């Protein structure tokens, strides 16, 4: 392990941290020190609060480190570079993927990027290690994790690529051209799943949700129809719409515990695929119905996914934005100026009003 002393006047910085369960505050935290010659330290330029930040603060998951700095969605400026970093320099503006794989573990060679060496090893920023909601934060293996912001790509679009786009597109990777696709949930991830499914050539895309701000954007991204779970029995609607066969792909990006069972109910026998992108909080079970699973013999497939990380993934998404394949910044409904507004942004994402999809905080740093 390599350590680099940093010549800075102040050893503390502003950070938005989980002080105790159900309470997050802006605190004074220790500035990071480079832990490896392959790492960088960054200052966030634009950040966004995610539903999983809300779950970290208000959910019922495992105990978190004391004063855990939150956040995993950021576009940032490089401020300190390890001596073995090749491709990045101080002052570069980069997109920081929410998933930062451990490229030093041999599990990577099995293609196991998200869980190399330990379960959820790529999913640490703001969950088990200090996140991006701070004046400075560290990212490991910069050459393998960061992506330069291309000319012509807005801060907002790059910010939406770091988590929302990569996660939604992960759900859409199982879609073949002409497929009938159901997307359950039209928050940021669901909207990006709709967009990804359309880009992969899906035929009919049935989006399920009721949030007012999301509905027109769902159509913009390629939804054929948007239906509300408040007005319809979704399983019956999908089965009727497909002449009893069910959808080719069902992508779960919202809902409750029952939603998982509903997805099994409405997907095709033999070739149907359910892709889960939702974090199911709390204890208990996600139930697979015996009847619609053919009592275990239906041939339906279930995939439980995280958004993919790493530099190449992020560069590909940013290239799609640069060449106008999609516009993820349409999802930003609330923009703030000043880091202190992260407090209000967390509350907005917790309350999830009808006019809220995603926030962007321009830190001013």
What are the functions of these language-model segments?
Residues 32-47, 60-109, 130, 150-153:
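Glycine-rich beta-strand-centered segment in the early N-terminal region that forms part
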Residues 2-13, 261-265, 310-365:
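C-terminal hydrophobic helical "lid"/dimerization subdomain
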Residues 151-232, 236, 249:
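Mid-domain Rossmann-like dinucleotide-binding core that forms the NAD(H)/NADP(H) cofactor-binding site
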Residues 95, 248-251:
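N-terminal Rossmann-like NAD(P) cofactor-binding module of classical short-chain dehydrogenase/reductase
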Residues 219, 256-326, 362-365:
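Glycine-rich phosphate-binding loop and adjacent beta-alpha segment
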Residues 1-75, 135-141, 147, 362-365:
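Short N-terminal strand-loop motif that marks the start
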Residues 35-36, 89, 176, 268-269, ...:
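Residue-level recognition of short, solvent-exposed, well-ordered loop/turn junctions
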Residues 102-184:
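NAD(P)H dinucleotide-binding glycine-rich loop of Rossmann-like/cofactor-binding domains
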């Amino acid at each position: 392990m390599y350590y680099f002393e940093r010549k800075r006047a102040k050893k503390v910085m502003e950070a938005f941290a989980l002080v105790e369960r159900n309470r997050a505050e802006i605190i004074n935290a220790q500035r990071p020190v480079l832990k490896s010659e392959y790492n960088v330290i960054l200052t966030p330029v634009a950040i966004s609060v995610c539903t999983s930040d809300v779950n970290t603060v208000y959910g019922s998951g495992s105990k978190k480190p004391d004063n855990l700095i939150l956040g995993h969605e950021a576009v940032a400026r490089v401020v300190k570079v390890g001596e073995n970093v090749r491709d990045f320099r101080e002052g570069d503006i980069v997109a920081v993927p929410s998933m930062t794989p451990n490229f030093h573990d041999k599990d990577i060679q099995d293609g196991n990027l998200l869980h190399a060496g330990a379960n959820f090893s790529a999913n640490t920023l703001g969950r088990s290690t200090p996140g991006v909601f701070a004046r400075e934060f560290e990212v490991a293996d910069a050459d393998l994790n960061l992506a330069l912001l291309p000319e012509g790509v807005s801060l907002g679009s790059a910010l939406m690529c770091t988590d929302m786009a990569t996660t939604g597109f992960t759900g859409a990777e199982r879609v073949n051209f002409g497929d009938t696709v159901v997307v359950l949930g039209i928050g940021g991830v669901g909207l990006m799943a709709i967009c990804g499914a359309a880009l992969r050539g899906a035929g009919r895309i049935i989006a399920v949700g009721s949030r007012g701000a999301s509905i027109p954007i769902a159509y913009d991204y390629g939804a054929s129809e948007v239906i509300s779970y408040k007005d319809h029995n979704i399983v019956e609607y999908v089965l009727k719409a497909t002449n009893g066969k069910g959808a080719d792909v069902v992508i779960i990006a919202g809902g409750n515990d029952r939603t998982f069972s509903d997805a099994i109910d409405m997907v095709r026998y033999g070739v149907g695929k359910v892709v889960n992108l939702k974090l199911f909080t709390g204890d208990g079970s996600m139930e697979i119905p015996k009847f619609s699973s053919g009592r275990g013999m239906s041939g339906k497939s279930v995939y439980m996914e995280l958004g993919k990380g790493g530099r190449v993934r992020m560069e590909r998404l940013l290239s799609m934005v640069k060449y106008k394949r999609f516009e993820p910044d349409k999802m930003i409904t609330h923009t703030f100026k000043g880091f202190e507004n992260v407090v209000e942004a967390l509350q907005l994402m917790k309350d999830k009003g009808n006019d809220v999809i995603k926030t962007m905080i321009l830190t001013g740093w």
